[in-house]
């Protein structure tokens, strides 16, 4: 049934100050999809869901005098907590955007109503 096909896309941006390495950040982003799924999405073939993330924990010094730079990394055995927290944060962000949005006009003057009008 085409009415039940997945429609729409979402972009999820995860920012953290945890000192995550590239591989760790990719693992965290995979768990961000759990928050999306908790809100009812099934991420079908037609959806264009994008997950990007960054950490600002390990800055790069501006001085050229330092030949080497020490980086910190988050302990692997504590990543389960981060996975759980990112899923909760994504879920909460989606629910907040749904309940706090305002009605707005769309194409050809069609009004897209907000859930906040009915709550």
Task: Give residue spans per PLM region.
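A structural signal for small-residue-enriched, beta-sheet-centric alpha/beta enzyme cores
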Residues: 1-119
